[in-house]
């Protein structure tokens, strides 16, 4: 029983990262029907941004430690990563959208942006792995034989709060209703006076900011960074979003946790080399049975 409970909490933490990243994929796809394959590398870049922000703040403000350092780093990282997402949208996606480019070209562009971010970080910062600094003091609670850390709780709570906040924004706010309206008919929406480009810009900013939250928490939890760290976790988060039902916020959230649970419990019972194989086979079976994912809805498209 202890073994199960301990791995249950480990799976919650690991699934939280997948969920937070998957929500970013879901947000952009839900509005534009665009899979932003660079999202995993935006997550990676946010970790580097947080790393250098901590170094800068620690060097220039020696008394800044603990929670204040974490909050300032988090807010600044979210803002800078949001600017990165907006810049990518303005420079890469918006021109293609204005020209009515085929979706294949948009997908290729997204992949190229990811490669640029990876190799740009590689060229500037080198291939050597960097160790993410300790920002918050880690508290360990032993509940019987089960060990839970304060960081683990922070990660899980952050994922839940982000999900709830995103649901509120999309379902209850005027901007969220505009986002949903664009997903239904982006050509008719300008006739209703809704500023399409402004809504799209906000969508990319919000999705990138979510990646930043995941990035800084991931760096604190697994403090080894490299330029390619976002590639695999980004692809897995995308698959989790698809399994949950791409474009559905609840589906992306649950899909991330599902993948986290599969990976942790496969590793608990089998050699770690089987983790990806078994995980992807299970996810493939799920998609074979229900191609739209758990919460996705089949839609007809006129061609």
Could you tell me what each predicted segment is?
Residues 4-53, 91-101, 105, 245-249:
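Single transmembrane alpha-helix segments in multi-pass membrane proteins
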Residues 115-143, 268-275, 295-303:
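Extracellular/periplasmic helix-loop junction at the C-terminal end of a transmembrane helix
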Residues 39-87:
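Membrane-embedded helix boundary and interhelical linker motif in transport proteins
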Residues 2-17, 169-174, 203-241, 266-274:
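Inter-helical junctions in multi-pass inner-membrane proteins, predominant
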Residues 109, 187-191, 195-198, 270-303:
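Cytosolic-side transmembrane-helix boundaries in multi-pass membrane proteins
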């Amino acid at each position: 029983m202890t073994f199960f409970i301990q791995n249950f909490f480990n799976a919650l933490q690991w699934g939280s990262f997948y969920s937070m990243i998957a929500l970013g994929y879901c947000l952009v796809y839900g509005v534009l029907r665009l899979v932003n394959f660079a999202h995993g590398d935006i997550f990676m870049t946010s970790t580097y941004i947080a790393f250098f922000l901590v170094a800068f703040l620690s060097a220039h403000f020696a008394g800044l430690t603990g929670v204040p350092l974490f909050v300032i780093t988090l807010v600044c990282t979210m803002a800078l990563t949001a600017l990165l997402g907006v810049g990518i949208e303005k420079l890469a996606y918006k021109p293609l959208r204005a020209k009515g480019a085929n979706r294949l070209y948009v997908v290729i562009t997204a992949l190229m942006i990811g490669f640029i971010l990876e190799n740009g970080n590689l060229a500037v910062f080198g291939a050597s792995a960097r160790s993410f600094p300790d920002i918050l003091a880690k508290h360990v609670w032993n509940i019987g034989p089960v060990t839970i850390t304060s960081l683990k709780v922070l990660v899980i709570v952050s994922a839940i709060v982000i999900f709830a906040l995103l649901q509120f924004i999309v379902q209850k706010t005027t901007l969220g209703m505009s986002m949903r309206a664009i997903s239904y008919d982006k050509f008719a929406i300008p006739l209703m006076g809704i500023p399409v480009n402004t809504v799209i810009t906000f969508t990319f900013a919000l999705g990138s900011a979510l990646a930043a939250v995941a990035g800084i928490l991931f760096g604190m939890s697994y403090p080894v960074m490299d330029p390619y760290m976002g590639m695999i976790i980004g692809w897995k988060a995308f698959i989790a979003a698809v399994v949950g039902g791409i474009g559905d916020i609840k589906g992306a959230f649950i899909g991330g946790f599902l993948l986290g649970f599969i990976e942790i419990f496969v590793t608990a019972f089998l050699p770690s080399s089987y983790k990806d194989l078994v995980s992807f086979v299970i996810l493939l079976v799920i998609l074979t049975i229900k191609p739209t994912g758990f919460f996705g809805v089949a839609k007809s498209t006129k061609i």
